[in-house]
Each structure stands twice: as C-alpha cells, then as structure tokens.
From Swiss-Prot:
Residues in Sequence repeats: 7-84, 100-178
Keyword Magnesium belongs to the record: no
Coiled coil listed as a keyword: no
Family: Belongs to the TBP family.
UniProt keyword annotations, A-Z: DNA-binding, Repeat, Transcription, Transcription regulation
Protein name as annotated: TATA-box-binding protein 3
Protein origin, superkingdom: Archaea
Gene3D superfamilies in the record: TATA-Binding Protein
One of the Pfam families matching this protein, by short name: TBP
Listed GO biological process terms: DNA-templated transcription initiation
InterPro entries: TBP, TBP_CS, TBP_dom_sf
A Gene Ontology molecular function term of the record: DNA binding
Amino acid sequence: MESTITIENVVASTRLAEDFDLEKMMESGLEGAEYNKVKFPGLVYRINNPKAAFLIFTSGKVVCTGSKSIGNAHAAIINLANTLKSICCEKIDLEPDVRVQNIVASADLKTNLNLNTIAIAFGLENVEYEPEVFPGLIYRVEAPKVVVLVFSSGKLVITGGKCPEDCEEGLRIVKTEFDNLGLLY
C-alpha cells in the first residue's frame, strides 16, 4: 500500500522590481496578458514553457501559480523577468529571491475509507467532517503545518506545504495514524 505524492500546484512569490507600470507593460506587447484594474488590481499573464500563470502587481511583486515543481516555478519567474526586461522594464532583478508560499499535492491510498469511522476515531481535535457541506474529511497536521483532505475513495489532497517534504511527511503521518487505528483495509 505504498503511496507517494504528486505535486499538482506550486505557488511562489517574489519581487522583480521596485514598481511596475502595468499600463505600459500591456502596451509593450506582453502577448496574452490581461489587465482590467476595475476587476482586479494585477495583470494576469500565462506562459506555456514551463506552464505557469503570473499575477503581476504595481508594487513590483509577482505571484506565480500553476507550476508542477519548485524548479519549474523558479524557471518560470526567471523567464518572466527576462521577458519583462526585454520588452519594457529595465530595472528588473534577474536573480530574485523566490519564496514558495504553498504546495498542493495529491496521493492515493488505493483503498476505500470509512470517513465516519475516521472522524469518530480521531475525535474533534484536528478533524472536521461535515458530509452535508463537503464530501471530504479535513485533517489538520500540526507539524509540518499541512492540511490533508481525505476522501472515501482513498484519494488525498495535501496543501499548505512549503516544500515537497512537508507534503510527504503529512502523507506519512496520516497513513501511520490510519494504519495504527486499523482503518486501512
């Protein structure tokens, strides 16, 4: 019943400049960019290699989402920095400090789970289970600080990690606790 995580999304942020003129950026030919400051204060820009989406703000800050690895998120941000430098922004940090804000991963225990039994066995301390509201059980792991969504199909979503190891450890903790309680069948 070995299970490992699959990274589904990495959210990373950085500061590429002191500030950005988003109107100028739109006029400079950033293909596919979307900016409507009435709807959202940032410019939205997507790339395909590596696949990522960016939220670019006037403060010079950038949020990158949609990458499947930390390396791809970092590469995407460097690509963005080079693109912006070449089309409109001279004062760009080409070696920015990239910080991972969140990793979302999935895993499959490859067995069906009785969520009512799990909720009763774990009590109310770190678990929320309201099937009328949400079909999964929400299990909060304290260290590392991750949240594991557990579904009756045995599929899990692990979120809140700052590195893949946080998600792996969250999975290991949940599997160990389920196994110790005899809940994996």
